[in-house]
Amino acid sequence: SAASDVYKRQLLDNFSSMLEKRGIKVDRPTPLDFNQPTSTPDWKAETMFGCMPPRDVLLTVGNEILEATMSYRCRWFEYLCYRPLLKQYYNEDPNMRHESAPKPRLTDADYRKDYLSDKIGIQKRLKWTEDKFFVTTEEEPLFDAADVLRFGKDLVVQHGFTTNLKGIDWLKRHYKDHRVHAVNFPGDPYPIHIDATFTPIKEGLIINNPQRRLPKEQRKLFENNGWEIIDAAQPAHNEPPPLCYSSVWLSMNVLVIDPKTVCVEKSEKYQAEQLDKLGMEVIPVDLRDAY
């Protein structure tokens, strides 16, 4: 309903003004009509479903903002929302680099036919994830920015549905000054994006989704470099809100403002309590109805 849309916008506006009061500059992208069909010579998509999270398409490393390839057809044109802001940054800052990865064709060759069929049970899906057998093929480089975490000169990239090995290789070749490490999380039957799975909180501390633990051999990279990985607290909810396309583990997708301050969704009391005990100042943010 229109009223609830106004309410949802108000929640985002409140979050934005809270950040601004703390001295953080907040830029808001220009929304498109996400309901419109899109097409290329290779395919047609009925809507631009999912084209709203800036975190998913823009990868910021140093003075560069890179537009990711994206791997959903409906999100192919998502970058258009951010072009006005990117143009502004480019004009205002002589050192800003605006880059774009090669746009993938996303033909049928990019996807395994029937991979997402309802006939396939959860055990088989978990086995596939463990074997790194995903819905996307290695036809061409694919990656979403939301699969990447930056730790100084190290980029940690989740290999899963939305990022393939060719995409990780492309990032390695592109970021010559960085070390790129592939990670995967066998407990997730639908591995899309790293943010509700593996979250750095402050230097030396990462929270990891206990249902999707980083495999033992991959933990060494972090532990050998002084990073402790602990299980994230349980979510406060048993299911996501209506029409929400994310899991209940959005509870751990927090916003770290500085090494001592973190924003947590206000209903996620267990996650807030855990971060409080870890010495963080927790800012509760009312955002669940805007997911």
Language-model features, listed with the residues they occupy:
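The feature marks the mature, well-folded catalytic cores of soluble enzymes
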Residues: 1-291
